[in-house]
Amino acid sequence: LWDTSVVQWGEIDIWINNAGQNTTRVFSWETDGTCTENIIKTNLIGMIYGSQIAATGMLKQGHGAIYSMEGLGSNNMVQPKTILYGTTKHALTYFMRGLAKELEGTNVIAGRLSPGMVLTDFITKTPDGKRSEVFSDEKFRKTFNILADKPETVAKYFVPRILKNLKNDAQIAWLTNRKAAWRFMTAGFRKDRLI
């Protein structure tokens, strides 16, 4: 991926690890071994490999920024039936903060992107492509319609901030605690807006 990108664009200024996988919404002991391995390989090992490749290439070229996409678990929140996903995102945050420390004194920075809840197939479909049970979970639907956004909304917020950021170990957060509180206070205006 790095080599192909360098051939296409010459240099890579920004690298974003955004691959993510989830399990079906079941308790951790009900998740089969293959699903457990896949989520760890995608969310954690893939992010680590991507970061290693990017750091090596960016240190050679003399500059760059590496970001990884946080998620549920990055903020220490524990949500039943999502703990395998949350565990990988908690580890992702630790890794990226550690990578930032290791990159201190270089012209390469590492940071984290915190999008909040985003309406993608990740939420609306199961890992095998079927319609997710979130549509029938009334509590989840209500919360999702209050807090979630479309990908293009979050991207419009992230892109200019990523381009301007020069700070190592930065967290660029879309759905802040303050914004979430405001959305709950104005929840009556957000009914069924996404799902």
Q: What is each stretch, according to the model?
A:
Residues 51-52, 97:
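A short, exposed helix-loop element centered on a Lys and neighboring polar residues
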Residues 112, 130-184, 188:
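C-terminal helical subdomain
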Residues 22-37, 81:
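Conserved mid-core segment of classical short-chain dehydrogenase/reductases
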Residues 1-10:
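Conserved amphipathic alpha-helix within the SDR
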Residues 67-91, 96-97, 101-104, 117:
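Catalytic loop of short-chain dehydrogenase/reductase
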Residues 11-12, 58-70, 105-108, 167-169:
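Active-site loop of short-chain dehydrogenase/reductase
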Residues 75, 115-125, 129:
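Short, flexible catalytic-loop segment of classical short-chain dehydrogenase/reductase
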